[in-house]
């Protein structure tokens, strides 16, 4: 579970929030993610439909020669309307044994993960990811066994 790279501040963007792009630092983070995430043997990449999420994982997806799947239910706009859609998405994705990268937002990612972690202590500072950070979720048969935090690429 990856939070998108650093985006332009909301105050600096006049368009719709879903169209808010990465800033210079976020674009650099996206490029640097390639060498980091190649080691995980990712088999599928799913992203929110927000431009900043798409642009975060698009370079990696190309480098891995994968198709990028856009999923609206993990967007901030969808989350504000119906939180259960993202929760159901998380419950479905955990059934898949493949290595999948999901790129979305705070508060969506922390709540999705919270619903999946029943038997482990999920207690990271504020239970939030900084831009470009990720949680690596180790699971087997729909049960989360461990969570590791992956720092954002340095810029």
Task: Set out the residue ranges of the language-model regions.
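Predominantly a core beta-strand signature of beta-propeller blades
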Residues: 68, 144-147
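Active-site-proximal alpha-helix that buttresses catalytic centers in soluble enzyme cores
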Residues: 1-81, 110, 122-133, 151
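Short, solvent-exposed aromatic-acidic interface loops
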Residues: 148-155
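Active-site-adjacent alpha-helix immediately C-terminal to a catalytic or transition-state-stabilizing loop
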Residues: 87-145
